[in-house]
Amino acid sequence: MLKRAVIFTLILSLAAIPAYSHELTIKAPNTAMKEGEPFPATVQSAHKFIVPEEVEILSRVKAGIIEGGKFIPSELKANEQGLCIDFTVTPKDLSQSVILAATKDGESWCVTNEGGKSGARKDFEAQGLKVLSANKYDKYAKAIFNTSHDDKNYGFVVGFPLEIVPVTNPADVKTGDYITVKILLNGQPYTGPVWATYDGFAPEYENTYAYYTEAESGEAHVKITAPGWWGIRAAQSGLPGVEGEYDNLNLRSFLLFEVK
């Protein structure tokens, strides 16, 4: 497969991935952690990186810290003014990097003769509506904090159905370098598109990324073009659905980290 790397702005029209579905990301007001002290962070949902646009339904979202190889969920609070979800973690060990994770169990979204509606295909058909398509969007985000050059935890695999895992230690990456990541789809190597960008690159425009490439056999290389809070994104659409509920399952995943 021919690999394409584009360093200039990409405003991508993703025909297979409708624009009405937001991306799930994690951001913190301050990336510096202190051991044993509360660390605030947010789950954001938006088309623009990384500009919050809406508060997701709390019952569908989980967010927290990875400790001892396990996900420890935090209490979530809707922040209507900030258009995000607030949560707090308390890291116990800062000898290695700290991973925060967030997931959204997406609802079935149906396109009907009366417009877009949230719910199962069978329920709308029972109401006499014509359902043109029914898709479910599950989303995952993983953010790495407190990285160091001797860190061994940055490559921890959380176990998302679609997950981006750094092969290169983010602490070793500088502007002009490439970071290598492996991408797993249900535990197997992912082949497909990969997007990357950083906070402040193009906050005015939706679906706009600083870099594009393609993963081959589960591996992708992204050139870092600026310091800051970076996000690498992968997406898999068209997975088998559940009869009567939705036709296709679509997965989105973000890896987030700081480049100093």
Regions found by a protein language model. Give the residues of each.
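Short, ordered, surface-exposed loop/turn motifs in non-cytosolic proteins
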Residues: 56-58, 187-200
